Amino acid sequence: SLVLHQDADPRTGGVAVCGFTTAGMVGVIATSHIIKMLALRQLGTVMHKDFPAVALIHDEVPKHPVRVYQGDGIGVFTSEIQFGNETDIPFATTVLEWFTKGGFDRLIIIDGITRPEKELTSGDLYGVGSISAARERLKRLDIEPIQQGVVSGITGFLLSEGDRLGIDITALLSEASPMYPDARAAALAVEAVSDLTGMEIPLTELLENARSIEDSVRDIIENASQMLPAPEPENTTDIDPSFG
């Protein structure tokens, strides 16, 4: 459940962005960069009885692994630990709770995808919109839509709920390496967030320090994952080979 800091006001408004620890760690790298570049303040954490007792240390400060941040017209939900897929629906429900309490207009999900049959080179970015307005935005930015396919995990559930409830949700799916953190794929998604929101989010630091960022994220995930059961293989967001 969402636990806010004392005296925190969850009403942020504007755009909500969320990212999770999935393929290529794209979501968590992208959201961490957005938080840093926009100097967002932490609003609270997400707690669950099955979460490990662990603190992730950032610049000497201990943090819970699942956190929410807010700034002027933007909120960010980020998870730095990969959980088993049995937590996908509770996680997604918590995201929707945060979205509602924050009074946001729309939600952007940043996620990584893999296509095992394709050799990854430059990488591609795909988009899915839950309502027609979201799909029109993607079209205006020439972000390739997924015509047919399957999006699994938290992202897939949120998109389906967006369609069911009429919530404006956009998923930015950046093709990433299935083997290691992919900061370059994250940069592609962050650039799209800038375009979708009109917010200036500098990319120079992310691109110039891609290797060190990837190494740092890998260390955090590996250390934290030792405290969790191994995730199910299907927890990675995949796309059905029929899409394109």
For each feature predicted by the language model, list its residue ranges.
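N-terminal short beta-loop-beta anion/metal-coordinating cradle
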Residues: 1-81
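Short beta-strand segments
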Residues: 18-19, 77-78, 109-111, 173-175
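Gly/Ser/Thr-rich loops at beta-strand to alpha-helix junctions
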Residues: 20-26, 83-85, 112-116, 152, ...
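Conserved active-site and cofactor/substrate-binding residues in soluble primary-metabolism enzymes
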Residues: 25-29, 86-90, 94, 149, ...
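Secondary-structure boundary elements
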Residues: 41, 90, 96-107, 164-168, ...
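Internal, conserved structured core segments that host functional sites
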Residues: 85-135
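Catalytic cores of processing enzymes, dominated by hydrolases/peptidases
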Residues: 116-196
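Extended, histidine- and acidic-residue-enriched regions that form the cofactor-binding/catalytic faces
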Residues: 168-244
